[in-house]
Amino acid sequence: MDREIFRRGLMLVLSSPSGAGKTSISRELLRREPGLTMSISATTRPRRPGETDGHDYFFVDATEFGLMINRDEFLEHAKVFGNYYGTPRGYVEETLQKGQDVLFDIDWQGTQQIRERLPADLVTVFIL
């Protein structure tokens, strides 16, 4: 009798100081690992030419972002250079439930927030 074993996905968080190469490493991991999905952040910053909502970011206004914080919809969030950024919990949970691993390219403060909110499925790598 063949039984398929379901594995819940893992969160792989790469964090580093600016310029240490985490984005380059993330791109290479995504290229090599077909089961790996990049986390998509929500942001209040304006959309840049060529960016797609739901692919590059989830673009929301500041009011909606604040409501999302109040509803505890983020695994992590921060204000950076006047704009808000955050990782929507629902998107990540849905992806993990499908058995897909989720890659995060975030700073160490975001990593700490995720560790506090969802520690069981978390693998962290700090790049120097």
Model-found features: residue ranges?
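Conserved catalytic network of the ASCE P-loop NTPase/AAA+ motor domain
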Residues: 5, 31, 49-52, 94-97, ...
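Extreme N-terminal, non-catalytic leader segments
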Residues: 1-12, 34
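N-terminal phosphate/diphosphate-binding loop that engages ATP/GTP or pyrophosphate donors
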Residues: 24-73
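Conserved glycine(s) of the Walker
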Residues: 16, 21
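ATP-dependent NMP and nucleoside kinases share a basic, alpha-helical "lid"
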Residues: 63-73, 87-128
